[in-house]
Amino acid sequence: MALTASVKEELAHLQVRKSAVRAAELSALLRFAGGLHIVAGRIVVEAELDTESVARRAVRTVGEVFGHECELGVMSGGGLRREPTWVVRVARDGEALARRTGLLDAHGRPVRGLPPTVVNGSVDESAAVIRGAFLAHGSLTEPGRAAAMEFTCPGPEAALALVGSARRLDVLAKARQVRGVDRVVVRDGDTIAALLTRLGAHRALLQWEDRRMRKEVRATANRLANFDDANLRRSAQAAVTAGAKVERALDILGDEAPEHLRAAGRLRVANKQASLDELGRLSDPPLTKDAIAGRIRRLLAMADRRAEELGIATTTEFAAQAGGAQARAH
């Protein structure tokens, strides 16, 4: 499965309990994937999505949080679009939903960016805004020099609002216009990893970082000619970062983590260059690639949740800080 699809599928099944956070996510999703239409003199809210599970998540939120009935349809792919498009539509209570999600202001005028209540909400709501925008029109490219998390925006005001939400999460995002289309882009690999963590895409993060490490190690290995120390340090950096995150998780959790998760973590720390397949074979008893990946993912997720409760650096933030300090030392 492509990275973008993996992230969307995982986020579509993320459990969120707070109604305000769910509302912020839906507000961004409708703003970035939808629009307001006048049909027979009535306002209709409509959003077009490329993933069925995302569309069904939106339908549930409309019903459970706002209490409105929602239609879900599908348009078959045609022309340049091969895949079907899922259409979420609220007709009978369209105006009420538009006002409550901030698509319309108090005077009934369309909001061009994002509503102030969402922009000025909590940090969790800021993360929900970015999650909703990604589910609507986000993409994640393969790790490498051109790695990017990108959001296609309905206009410059929405792009600037998204940049502001990212800033509240200490994430550097840049708004730009490409061929008349407004976009928001996050480029730095460590920043992308941190953002995936904040959005709740822990499984996709593990997949992305595994690919990132392999690509960086392969790229460096191809450049090595004389195997000098400086090049060897660069070739090992990605593996060291992955190991540092797991070490951080073990430090944060200590004995709080279940033994089988600690064992998987210790195995990763002791074999930083090994692939997930190799780690699985080294386990006692042997595990599948998915099983060892799942254990490491759960260990990191538990540690990140605990770190946020304690107000200390998460595994990704710690690894980024350690990498920066090491780079300055050299």
From Swiss-Prot:
> In the record, which residues are listed under signal peptide?
none
Q: Specify whether DNA-binding is a keyword of the entry.
A: yes
Protein keywords: Cell cycle, Cell division, DNA-binding
Q: Which GO terms describe its biological process?
A: cell division; regulation of sporulation
Recorded GO terms, molecular function? DNA binding
Keyword Cell cycle in the entry? The reply is yes
Q: Which residues bind DNA?
A: 275-308
What function does the entry list?
A: Involved in cell division and chromosome segregation.
Annotated family: Belongs to the WhiA family.
Return the protein name: Probable cell division protein WhiA
Protein species of origin = Kocuria rhizophila (strain ATCC 9341 / DSM 348 / NBRC 103217 / DC2201)
Q: Where is the organism placed in the taxonomic lineage, from the top?
A: Bacteria, Bacillati, Actinomycetota, Actinomycetes, Micrococcales
